[in-house]
Amino acid sequence: MPRIKQFVSFLSIILFLGASPAFAKEDTPETLDGTTKVSAEKLIEVLQSSPDLVVIDSRKPSDRAKGFIEGSVALPNTDTNEASLASNIKSKTTPIAFYCNGIKCGRSYAAAKIALGLGYTNIYWFRGGWDEWTQKGLPVMKN
């Protein structure tokens, strides 16, 4: 019986530490120089006013499988490079919007930084990402 108590105590400590804010993912920065940060509503406005806007879903395939913004291109940040961007975007002045899971997900931030470094100049960053989109009840697609 003492072993079970030890195990339960150990498990309780692990669960407590896992729930601790010290172990929570940090928020992404508020801004990314060289990009225009947009809300869900602003992204919709840009989509309506810029038909050539390319929306990049920087999330992992397992996240995208749960749903995505209609018309977005699946391009995880880990696969974002000169060749993958060039194959999805007409020119370095074409408007691009990057999104991921939300403010605690750094994937769209990382992908937008890569695009900036490669000379893309018309970048929107949807920092609130999937979390904001779904919390506002906006339409989603699923495969």
Write out the residue ranges for each language-model feature.
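Sec/Tat-exported extracytoplasmic proteins
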Residues: L47-P51, C100, L116, T134-G137
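N-terminal, post-signal-peptide region of Sec/Tat-exported proteins
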Residues: Q48-S84
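Conserved functional loop/turn residues at catalytic and ligand-binding sites
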Residues: F68, G119, G137
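Flexible, polar/low-complexity N-terminal or interdomain linker segments that lie immediately upstream
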Residues: P2-V54, P61-D63
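Active-site neighborhoods of enzymes that stabilize oxyanions during catalysis
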Residues: L138-N143
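Extracytoplasmic/secreted cell-surface and envelope-processing proteins
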Residues: R64-K66, G106-S108, T134-Q135
